[in-house]
Structures are given as C-alpha cells and as structure tokens.
Amino acid sequence: MKKAVHFGAGNIGRGFIGEILSKNGFEIYFVDTNKAIIDELNTRHSYEIGIASSSPEKISVSGVFGINNGENPKDVIEAIAQADIVTTAIGPNILPYIAELVAKGIQKRKEENKQVQIDIIACENMIGGSEFLEKKVAEYLSDSDKVYLANYIGFPNAAVDRIVPGQKHEDLLYVEVEPFCEWVIDESQIKNKSFKLEGVHYASNLEPFIERKLFSVNSGHATVAYSSAYKGYKTILEGLQHKEILSALKGVQKETRALLLAKWPQYFTEEDLMSYHQMIISRFANPKIIDEVTRVARTPIRKLGYDERFIRPIRELNERGLSYQNHLDIVGKIFAYQDENDSQSVQLQEKLSTMDFQRLIEEVTGLSNKKIILEIELVIKKYKNDSK
C-alpha cells in the first residue's frame, strides 16, 4: 500500500488532504504535536468527515496513523524515508519549523540509496508554499544532499480551497467541511510522475489559479470577516445578511476580476470569473457552515503582508492604473480590528497607539510606495476615528 506522510492533523489535514489521500489508496501518517489527536488516531486508525450541506453525508477515512513529532522525531524521519508522498497543512508560519525534520527524512532516503522520486507538497494559503519549504529544508542539507534532492525530490507548488470552520465535537477526530473542495498542483514541478491523485487538478502553470483562489476566496473571506467584526457580527453567515458587507465583498471581487483579467487574459474570461465569484458568495452563505469571525480574521498582521491577500492586489492594481478602493477600505478595517484573544491583533493595536502611522504601515506591509502608504494612513485614520 502506498504511504503518505502529512504534517498537520488539524481540521484541514483530516477534513481535506486526508480525504483525498485516502480515496487514492494511501495509508496516511499524520504528524502533529497534538498528543490527544495523535493518540486517538493510533487507537482507532479511522475517522469520519461530515459534509455540511442540505443533503448531509458522512465519509469514513481509514488506514490512518499518528506520529507525535515532538516526542518521536525519529519516527517522522523514518516515515518520510518510506513515503510515496509528503504533504503539509500547518500554516505558512509553521513551515520553517518542520524543515529540519523533512531534511533529515531526505538524508535518510539518500543514505538508504532510494532512487524513487517523491514529491513534497505544501498545501498552504500562500503563493509558492512548496518552494518556500524547499528553501528552508535546503538550509539543513550538505552539497551532496542537495544534488540528491535535485534528482529525486520535487517540491511542486499547490493551491488548496475548502472551507473548514472552527469546531468542537465529542469525537476528537470528527470534522465537518463544506461540499466544495479544490486542490491544484503545478504539474511542471512534479518529480514522481508514476501516479496522479484523483480529485486533484494538475496545471501546467499554477500561478493564475493560485492567484484566482487567494485573491478571491481568501481576500473575500477576510473582507466579510473584518467588515463583520467592524459591525459587531460574530459569524460570517450573520455578516453576509448585511447589505453593506455583501456590497463590500462584491466591490473587492470586482477589483479582483479586473486584476486577474489584466494579468491572465489567456486563462480567464469576465464570465468565468463572475460565475466563480458568485459561487464563492454562495459558499460563504452556506447555512450549514457556522464560521466564527474571529477564526477568519485571526493573525491580522500576517494578512497585511507584502504578498498577502490585500497588499499584493493593491500593489498590482496600482501598477496597472486600476482601482483598488474597496481593497484599501478593508485594509483600514484590518488595522482597526480588535480581538483581545489574538496576539497579533493586540500587538497591532499597541503599535497603532505608539508608532507613527506611516512607519507602522511600512513595517507591517513592507510597502515603500509613498502614495499607497498615504492612502492607507488616511483609511486607518477614518476607521480609528469612527470607532471612537
């Protein structure tokens, strides 16, 4: 039986990547530091996924195991050495922390003279996630290790899309997900061409698809979250009932369409993107998915990053002389976002009260364009004054 090592036994790992790998006949070794979940996986070797729709169904995933990388790092290294595929769903910020283990797994494959090619795929909400992980892994490799990596280890980038809300169940392993899911892998970067995963789309050029996803789903979800937080709503579903919030989402979507059509006219049409964006609205409005605003809005500093879901579209729209006022408005709401249980929100509010705004904008967003920095400063002041 083929073996998969998956870093991250959380809701996305179990409720999306695990489902696809299981359907493709893999034994799955989930790697995580959550002792309770790892122990439960090793006790039961199976779990259920609930599909949240008007016709609910349950999917059983079996042939699963858990490895606690905090307690048993050697077992992780051995699992990577024996794996046919390695995947991650741990969050962009955590990728550097698994790099050394992945490197040791690659070194063990080399020591055992394994000449079977393997792909390591970061399934994260970021552009170039697998390439980023490869760079971090390479920091732990010798020159001869790097030669082996170049020949036998692929790091194809991927785009993943499925809404998995925050949730708690009596059953530790049970997870509810929306019906829709999309996993796209850059075919040009694949090393192991002996199989293709069913349920996965392979693209010769991933970039247009990952930008469509990040600038539509992630930007859109965040638009609803920060707009809802500003109005005092607790869930995404509640917020979307408000005309102003739906209008804000549609405004961001309109600007996103303009950018995607300007960048990728050979891949998308206005009609395609309109249909895609309407589908996204219906996904966000799924009455069976109760998604907390605090979950979608968490880590605001990360979401204000230079290549993230708002600043990158703003930069690229500005370069093309296209409007980005709706994106800009949400940036103001992100700076105004307050959640005492979110360390980044607390940190951002502290900086707002102590730092010069323009210097703070430069620090958080990485922007150097004075025009955009000034525009962001004005929208920060607007929402700061409104909240008083």
UniProtKB/Swiss-Prot annotation:
GO cellular component: cytosol
GO MF: mannitol-1-phosphate 5-dehydrogenase activity
Domain of life: Bacteria
Pfam families noted in UniProt: Mannitol_dh (PF01232), Mannitol_dh_C (PF08125)
Reaction(s) catalysed by this chain's protein: D-mannitol 1-phosphate + NAD(+) = beta-D-fructose 6-phosphate + NADH + H(+)
InterPro entries: 6-PGluconate_DH-like_C_sf (IPR008927), 6PGD_dom2 (IPR013328), Mannitol_1_phos_5_DH (IPR023028), Mannitol_DH (IPR000669), Mannitol_DH_C (IPR013118), Mannitol_DH_CS (IPR023027), Mannitol_DH_N (IPR013131), NAD(P)-bd_dom_sf (IPR036291)
Record-level GO BP terms: mannitol catabolic process
Entry EC number(s): 1.1.1.17
Binding, NAD(+): 4-15
Disulfide bonds, paired cysteine numbers: none
Transmembrane segments: none
Class in the EC hierarchy, top level: oxidoreductase
Keyword annotations of the record: NAD, Oxidoreductase
Stored PANTHER family: ALTRONATE OXIDOREDUCTASE-RELATED, MANNITOL-1-PHOSPHATE 5-DEHYDROGENASE
Family per record: Belongs to the mannitol dehydrogenase family.
The protein's name in its UniProt record: Mannitol-1-phosphate 5-dehydrogenase
Source organism (scientific name): Lactococcus lactis subsp. cremoris (strain MG1363)
Lineage: Bacteria, Bacillati, Bacillota, Bacilli, Lactobacillales
